[in-house]
Amino acid sequence: MFKVGFIGTGVIFDLNILGYLNNPDVKITCLCNRTTAKAKEKVKKFNLDKNIPIYSDYREMLDKEDIDIVEILLPHQLHAEATIYAAEQKIKGISVQKPMALTLDQADAMIDACKKSGSILSIYENFLFAPHIKRAKELLEQDYIGDPSSIRIKTAMGGKGGWKIPISAEEWRRQPEKVGGAKRGSPVLFDNGWHDFVLAHWFFNEEVEKVFAWTGNSQGLDAPAYVMFKYKQKFEHVVPQYGNMEFSLLPEMEIPSNYYPTDEFIEIIASRGVMKINQGTSIGNKMSTSDIFAPIVIIRDGKVESYSDFEKDWKFSFINATNYFIDAIKNNKRPILSGEQARYILKFNLAAIESAESGKEIFLE
């Protein structure tokens, strides 16, 4: 049985912990949070061992506790140093919340440290394990709509509703040196937007040649924002492949959600059909229960098909992601978003931010 320690017990902890609670291969044996009272609240909330060790310093926890897996759920500027320290303690499995790091140099240092220690590094990406995303990917891999030529990912965010976010969590995301990205910080493109950059790469399995982006400045956020990109075409395709991401704010819309008041709507156009993914974190859950918007819709051969044969709740993306990571550690497998793969996503993301700041098209070399 693998012993697991958590560094950080903020809001996202409530989802990251779910996959560990009923998995027979693991046991949560220690927690760390700068404010230990918050960690104690989580012990009660999730019925953990009341005598579980709680630390305020992650270094002390990693020094004293004999653990096999560590979940790093810290503000972005701490990802690299915590990962490197965990690797130096030869922790077998290291899972890091997105984004991977603030810079490519930090990402390289994380990768090198884990290679040196033999640690398996994974950047946590629940979106790849969301049931509706997995189903959409399966349909693409089955060549059901032909060769994909374009992808559009539209993120709607910032509405009323959803769970309560502590002021402290909002505050550090408004500090450029902590959230990362642009000189004035990028809480949209670099934090929430990370998921979209991952999906753009994962759905097409192609690297990006160039990117152009524009960002506004509303409500202290780098939004609205628009990102356009062209794929390299490593493989032969029917037509050249392009994509775009759009980030819009809905400050007055009531968004029913058990989680963040945010959603991602995806459209993929291919040589023989079109796929529309309506399922999402919050609005998508409500929409997909209606007769109008099925979770996945495919238009092909003059017909419209819908798919809903999967779990809808966003929590399953976390449970699935964690179970996958545990299995990767158990069987010494390369994670789906390894350090090297996440470094590429970081490069793609930072290129878009550089474009927005410079007003120029950026090539990914």
Predicted features and spans:
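Hydrophobic residues in well-ordered beta-strands that form the structural core
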Residues: 95-96, 121-123, 277
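C-terminal helix-rich "cap/oligomerization" subdomain common to oxidoreductases
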Residues: 26, 69-71, 232-238, 286-289, ...
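Active-site loop of classical SDR/Rossmann-like NAD(P)-dependent oxidoreductases
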Residues: 34, 311-322
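Beta-loop-alpha module in the N-terminal Rossmann-like domain of NAD(P)-dependent dehydrogenases
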Residues: 52-113
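Rossmann-fold dehydrogenase core element
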Residues: 109-127, 147-151
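N-terminal Rossmann-like dinucleotide-binding module
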Residues: 1-47
